[in-house]
């Protein structure tokens, strides 16, 4: 009676739970950045912001302990002739070592080559592979024309500056947010950082989650509330959470960030549900053998009654599954699960192995 359907019901249940729950609030915040400015004989350069970010997933040349220094610059033509500006006009040194420039995940973020007329400006980002917390020098040499070489300008950047280091500390916030969602929704745990990281009201999101879970179970199983009352559904939801919390796990790591999107690599140790349908079926057969006059409705209610305990008995699977999940950032740097992305479903599916 419950064979083949149990697995699909479980997955649809989790998907509906996530869909209803994963919508956080957004508020605006004003950001103010100090500017550093220097001039050559034909150009004025401003460093508007410096931060650490993660290498692009396409950049295979970086080591695991390296980061990317992202420098936002504005260049103004203070000469009389048109000025060509390109990211290649900039070099970065870490000590005496010239560091490699790199491309971001979204190439449009990088300072693009352009020609600007007198008194006009262009702004963009520079990306360099660096070791975190070092001293850097950014050099800008305007493109030369004829025999006269324009003056270069050099900026010193302190990679140990607290403000810059703080950007490195935030690089795993999207991974922490994903783990927090799993904690409070799938595992039924408390997570003290949930609201700070995601911007969602924990009580509201858990209540929405639980109500959606019960509706989702009825919808996916095709059962009416006649068979599954609110108490039975509460027990099923709580049993699933307890079973997942006890016998599954997740390790999350942010692997790339582009603007307001991040890719988090989630390595999931799922529960092994290969025996669940058969075990519930055996329970129902045993029930019928002892209650030969039982109706179909009574048998279904019994199956729903034993479902939570049987689920909690599921052990961890012998293998892990790694999936990529997209997270989206609101305007005050809080990370939320992107339910419009197909990978959210893959994350849910990763928690159970048939």
From Swiss-Prot:
The record ties this protein, via InterPro entries, to: DUF4352, DUF5105, Immunoprotect_excell_Ig-like
Q: Which residues form the signal peptide?
A: 1-21
Q: Does the keyword Membrane apply?
A: yes
- Covalent lipidation (N-palmitoyl cysteine) residues? 22
Major location category of this protein: membrane
**Topology in membrane:** Lipid-anchor
> Signal: is it a keyword of this entry?
yes
Annotated lipid attachment (S-diacylglycerol cysteine): 22
User: One GO CC annotation, please?
Assistant: plasma membrane
Task: List localization entries.
Answer: Cell membrane; Membrane raft
Keyword list (alphabetical) reads: Cell membrane, Lipoprotein, Membrane, Palmitate, Signal
Question: Known Pfam families for this protein?
Answer: DUF4352, DUF5105
Q: What is this protein called?
A: Uncharacterized lipoprotein YcdA
Q: Which organism is it from?
A: Bacillus subtilis (strain 168)
Q: Specify the taxonomic lineage.
A: Bacteria, Bacillati, Bacillota, Bacilli, Bacillales
- Name the encoding gene, please: ycdA
């Amino acid at each position: 009676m419950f064979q083949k359907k149990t697995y699909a019901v479980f997955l649809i249940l989790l998907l509906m739970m996530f869909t209803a729950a994963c919508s956080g609030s957004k508020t605006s915040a004003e950001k103010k950045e100090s500017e550093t400015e220097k001039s050559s004989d034909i150009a004025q350069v401003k460093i508007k912001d410096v931060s650490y970010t993660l290498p692009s997933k396409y950049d295979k040349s970086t080591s695991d302990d390296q980061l990317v220094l992202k420098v936002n610059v504005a260049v103004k033509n203070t000469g009389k002739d048109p000025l060509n500006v390109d990211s290649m006009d900039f070099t970065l040194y870490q000590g005496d070592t010239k560091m490699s420039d790199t491309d971001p995940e979204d190439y449009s973020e990088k300072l693009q080559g352009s020609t600007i007329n007198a008194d006009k400006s262009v702004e963009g980002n520079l990306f360099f592979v660096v070791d975190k917390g070092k001293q850097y020098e950014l050099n800008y040499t305007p493109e030369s024309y004829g025999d006269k070489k324009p003056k270069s300008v050099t900026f010193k950047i302190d990679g140990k500056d607290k403000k810059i280091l703080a950007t490195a500390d935030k690089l795993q916030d999207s991974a922490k947010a994903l783990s927090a969602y799993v904690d409070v929704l799938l595992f039924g745990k408390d997570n003290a950082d949930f609201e700070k990281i995601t911007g969602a009201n924990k009580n509201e999101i858990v209540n929405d989650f639980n109500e959606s879970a019960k509706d989702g179970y009825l919808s996916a199983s095709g059962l009416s509330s006649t068979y599954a009352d609110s108490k039975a559904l509460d027990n099923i939801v709580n049993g699933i959470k307890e079973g997942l919390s006890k016998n599954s796990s997740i390790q999350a790591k942010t692997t790339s960030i582009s603007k307001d999107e991040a890719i988090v690599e989630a390595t999931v140790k799922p529960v092994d549900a290969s025996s669940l349908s058969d075990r519930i079926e055996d329970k129902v057969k045993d029930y019928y053998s002892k209650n030969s006059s039982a109706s179909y409705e009574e048998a279904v209610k019994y199956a729903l009654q034993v479902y939570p305990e049987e689920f909690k008995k599921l052990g961890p699977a012998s293998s892990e599954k790694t999936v990529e999940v997209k997270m989206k950032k609101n305007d005050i740097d809080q990370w939320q699960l992107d339910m419009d992305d197909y990978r959210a479903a893959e994350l849910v599916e990763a928690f159970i192995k048939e």
